[in-house]
Amino acid sequence: MTRAIVIGGGIAGLSSAALLARDGYDVTLLEKNASVGGRAGSWEKDGFRFDTGPSWYLMPEVFDHFFRLMGTTAAEHYQLLRLDPGYRVFFEEDVRAGTPPLDIRDSREANLDLFEQREPGSREKMSAYLDSAKDTYEMAKLRFLYTSFAKFGPLLRADVLKRLPKLLSLLRVSLADFAARYVSSPTLQQVLGYPAVFLGSSPYITPSMYHLMSYLDLEDGVLYPVGGFHKVIRGIEKVAEAAGVTIIRNARVTSIDTDGPGSGAHVTGVTYTGPRGGKPKTLLADVVVSSADLHHSETALLPPAQQTYSQKWWDTRVAGPSAVLVYLGVRGRMTQLDHHNLFFTSDWNDNFGRIFNEPRSIPDPASIYVCRPNTTDPFVAPGSDTNLFVLIPVPADPSIGAGGLDGQGSPQVEAAANAAIAQIARWAKVPDLAERIVVRRTIGPADFAGDLNTWLGTALGPSHILKQSAFFRAGNKSKKVKGLYYSGGSSIPGIGLPMCLISSEILIKRLRGDGSTEPLPEPLFPTVDRTV
């Protein structure tokens, strides 16, 4: 059989390995850590169970499609609940005025009503905004997300050409400016601009093409996998193993091996060691797929002559934010919070400027995200206690430091965590929050860099600014080494769990020479064994 090695056991690596095995390859996956999942991990302490990363389940059809490609369904592996409210928003100016937070509902009509209440006369314009968001989203799925851009002919379709003037306009205007055309309320503009953070970016530098994200949270709805996101990871791991994938954990890849030193060589396999070094081991392969951070894959695992994306190239790129993550076990209930909660400061220019512009620093006060999953799932915290996951966007800079248990992380990380805890206590009216904390763990940019090998300690990957979107984003095939491919958030189509699943499908299409733009037919039928 044709042998394939996948580097990295995050969602992109697991799904890539699964689809490769389904396609007929003999697949081995190497994961540097003791467990798979990457950013989408799980941590437990004293009866509290935390998702360590992703917590928003959007684009459910992408997950369903992946599982159907594998001959099963998402529903066979985990249960989904629809959230209503989808999320709650605390605005700084509302806190000052004593106004209740805004609950974003699970339907278009309910959210149009909310916008109309906040800004009388906005309903008609917001209806047009959501119509445009949905149309752009459907066009993206059909023509731009499931393609490797290896061939541009399939993109020259009548439906694309018809929308070309609109698409070009959406690329030239920022998301912030585009949203301001539809609503004048600064708080509503924040609701429309915040999805840029999911893209590792700022609404001031993100193309308005991405207003399509508002279709997902304001109309399509927000879901939750019961038990947490590790259930999703476990489901993908199970279908991968059922397809024949061999998973080797605690395997730190030290090099991608080739049959020659220069450009044009072919992969022969990889070399790896255990977590504490030891004697290197070599695995042979006809195809190598790295789902690890692309900067690490290129600059650490390949010599300069074989790097498609050299350090010089990376020096011209923009990293998405890093984050300080805070996992809190809190005694008692916190009904002031919903499942998903956003805390928006009034001065977003300052917030995003501190993250992306020099001199960079941790915003204070910061716009933060807080997840309280036991609003929906009683099994993530003991009894009537509360599980909180807090995300504070910070610059992609490992020098900010690492996290730790019980306040023992780096000073900047713990200071950001303390500020966020105080902010939640004040804005959500939980004055004794700090005294009720019984479990505390933090993660900082240095942890992302060290544990996940991420470029500059980014929590997400390269930002989705224009020059790093669609066909401008790093591709999924090496230009210097034959048989070397990529998947994951660093390459096309981009950041987020759904995009990582799509990247694994684009990989299969690239290997097959399939330049189409549509998702593959379900289920996936094998085309290998063959010469690559």
Regions found by a protein language model. Give the residues of each.
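Rossmann-like flavin
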Residues: 94-205
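Mid-domain catalytic core of redox enzymes
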Residues: 252-382, 525-528
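Active-site-proximal substrate-binding core of FAD-dependent oxidoreductases
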Residues: 258, 512-532
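Helical element adjacent to the flavin cofactor pocket in flavoenzyme catalytic cores
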Residues: 212-279
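N-terminal glycine-rich phosphate/pyrophosphate-binding loop and immediately adjacent elements
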Residues: 2-141
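A glycine-rich dinucleotide-binding beta-alpha-beta segment and adjacent secondary-structure elements
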Residues: 185, 189-199, 363-369, 430-493
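A conserved FAD-binding loop/helix module that cradles the flavin
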Residues: 54, 489-511
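C-terminal segments that line or cap access tunnels to active or ligand-binding sites in enzymes
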Residues: 331-446
